[in-house]
Amino acid sequence: MFVKPGSTISLTCSIRLFSSPPTSIQWFRDTRALNLDSARGGVSLENEKTPQGTRSTLIVTKATGDDTGNYTCSPSSGHAASVMVHVVDGKQYLVKLAFEIAR
């Protein structure tokens, strides 16, 4: 997933109810648990129980390059899911991509 600096990142993890619902859902960036109370601010989590299971949405506002990473949603019961997020200026990415293709 590619996003521009200053935009909002919204990642949703849906945990389907097969047996027991998860007692907790933890989010990670790379290998570190996300701290919703960090000095960076602008990071929030919304968890919602639905008839089908649980939905957890991670919201990161005013994205910067420091927010680039592999985001993982890890429920206490069930399998984790991950997505790679890149915060880049579109022009910089096109130049890098052109360089990689030229090699």
What is the predicted role of each segment?
Residues V43-L45, A81, R103:
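A short local loop/turn or secondary-structure capping micro-motif enriched for an aromatic residue
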Residues R16-P21, K49-G53:
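Short, charged helix-to-loop "capping" segments that act as catalytic/coupling loops
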Residues F28-S38, P51-Q52, S77-G78, H86-R103:
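Flexible inter-domain hinge/linker segments at boundaries of tandem extracellular adhesion modules
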Residues M1-F2, R40-N70, S76-S77, V87:
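Extracellular beta-strand/loop-rich beta-sandwich domains predominantly from IgSF
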Residues I25, S56, A81-V83:
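Extracytoplasmic/periplasmic beta-strand context in beta-sandwich domains
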Residues M1-I9:
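Short, solvent-exposed loop/linker segments at the N-terminal edge
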Residues F2-V3, S20-P21, L34-N35, D67, ...:
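Eukaryotic short linear interaction motifs
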